[in-house]
Amino acid sequence: MADSPSEGFLGTAYDLETGEQTLDHYQRWAGTYDQEVGVDNGYAQPARCAAALARVASSCDHVLDVGCGTGLSGVALRDAGFTRLDGCDFSPPMLERAAETGVYRRLFEADLNTGLGTDDAYDHAVAVGVFSFGHIRPDALREVLRVVRAGGAVVVGVNDHFWEVGELPAELDAIEADGLASVASREHGEHLPGAAIMGWVIVLVRSGN
């Protein structure tokens, strides 16, 4: 991809095609992820997603950080005032780094493509950078919605590269058509400014009573 970043693990993150490749990539990246993504490239999506959730949720609500990685998104949620945070990821080394942040009440290993947990277990969920090449299928967004209570929000942060493929926008349309959730907002802005990558923050509200 012509405008993909070219340094370190980030340079090949957009070339991943399978779950096995993705798991191996992120397990090897865990030790330097925060430096490369957060410090060197100014990862903007965690703070943008946390701010979007703060506009529609109470700070005391129970939030699941889906694909929490090393915990950059959890720290952003904490900084936005949220204190009841759980996180999940499919990479144990990433979860070990997330535990070091001290912001999560519970961390657990999970593969969003195969199942996440109990129905209606959380007030809200965030998925920052989770839906991308080789990561999670767009239809797995339905699994995130399943574990959020009716009326709860799901905030998704996605880079322009994946958004422009069209699979995620199509899935959002299908979710609305099926009556599962409504898209409350879509905001375009910085995703990874150090690599000149923009992205979207989407807020869905789960349907039901």
Predicted segments, located by residue:
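Class I SAM-dependent methyltransferase SAM/SAH-binding core
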Residues: 64-66, 70-115
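A short acidic, Gly/Pro-enriched loop at the edge of an enzyme's catalytic core
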Residues: 116-125
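N-terminal, positively charged/glycine-rich alpha-helical extensions of SAM-dependent methyltransferases
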Residues: 1-32
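Core SAM-dependent methyltransferase catalytic element
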Residues: 194-209
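Conserved SAM-binding loop and adjacent beta-strand
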Residues: 34-50
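Conserved beta-strand signature within the Rossmann-like core of class I S-adenosyl-L-methionine
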Residues: 151-159
